[in-house]
Every structure is written in structure tokens, then in C-alpha cells.
Regions:
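Residue-level signal for inorganic ion chemistry
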Residues: 15
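A short beta-alpha structural unit
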Residues: 52-70, 122-124
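PLP-dependent enzyme catalytic core of the Aspartate aminotransferase-like
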Residues: 96, 100-162
Length: 162
């Protein structure tokens, strides 16, 4: 039992309006985000060596791309991306601010060191193809800059020569 008048009527009306706005053109919004996500994933995997998609290639949220970049530290990569106007995260939204690798990636069996080099891009309906192009233009150079300073990357390059 509730007493009459205790319901949050403005909140209920606001929730109804929010749901209406969310589901207006819902399929078109999902299609747009999926297209942007797929372009981002394809472009990064093609332009950055030792880069892989974490998770299933198609059975994933339309707005989510989690990319593992080997031989770089995820937090450093995030800092450089941020300095270039690119927003990303190294863990799940519920663990933002933590330096630990994503517990989800660890549960998927991704080794600790590879999970530490993983970043998550979360897209929204406001994102544009031009913004994806900026990421695809800037991120490969940022990763290369980081690898050029990495002794581990130097070992990998030497091993590839032999």
C-alpha cells in the first residue's frame, strides 16, 4: 500500500518522455552506431600491428569497441588520446578511475598484460563519421610513438628481423 499522492508524478512523466525519445527511430540509431563501430574496429585493426578486437566481432553492443593494443600501457595510451581530443576508457564504466585491467577481459581469458593494453570506445548517436576518421588518423601514430619508447617493442622488432 501506498497513500494517494506519494507517487513522483513529474518523475514518472519525465521517464515516459525519456523512453519515447530513446525509442524514436531506435533501429536507425542502432544501425548508425553499428556502422560507426565497425568502421572504427576495421580501421584500427588494419592500421595498427599487434592490435586485436576483444570480444565477439558481431555479437556485441552496437556502440562498443574494445581494442587490445599489445606492447603499450592502456593508461598511457588513454592519456595521449585524451591530449588529442579522443575520449576512451581502459575498463568498464563501473570501474572507471581504477588502474586495474578490466575484470570482464580477464574473465574472457585475456592475459593480464594484454588486458592492461586494452581500451574501450563507447559510441553514441551523436558521434559522427568524421570523429571516427579522427581516431583512425591519430591513434596509429600515438601507438607507434609509445612503442618507439618501449624496450619490449624493441625486443619484438628484433625478433621479427631474425
Amino acid at each position: 500500500g501506498r497513500r494517494a499522492g506519494t507517487e513522483n508524478v513529474p518523475g514518472i512523466v519525465g521517464l515516459a518522455k525519456a523512453m519515447e525519445l530513446t525509442y524514436t527511430d531506435f533501429d536507425a540509431k542502432i544501425e548508425k552506431m553499428t556502422k560507426l563501430r565497425d568502421k572504427l574496429i576495421k580501421g584500427l585493426l588494419e592500421s595498427i600491428p599487434y592490435c586485436k578486437l576483444n570480444g565477439h566481432p558481431t555479437k556485441r553492443l552496437a556502440n562498443n569497441a574494445n581494442i587490445g593494443v599489445e606492447y603499450v600501457e592502456g593508461e598511457s595510451l588513454l592519456l595521449l588520446l585524451d591530449m588529442n581530443g579522443i575520449a576512451a576508457s581502459s575498463g568498464s564504466a563501473c570501474t572507471s578511475g581504477s588502474l586495474d585491467p578490466s575484470h570482464v577481459l580477464l574473465a574472457l581469458g585475456i592475459p593480464h598484460e594484454k588486458a592492461h593494453g586494452s581500451i574501450r570506445f563507447t559510441l553514441g548517436v551523436q558521434n559522427t563519421e568524421e570523429e571516427i576518421d579522427v581516431v583512425l588518423e591519430k591513434m596509429p601514430a600515438i601507438v607507434q610513438r609509445m612503442r618507439d619508447m618501449s624496450p619490449l617493442w624493441e625486443e619484438v622488432k628484433n625478433a621479427m628481423k631474425n
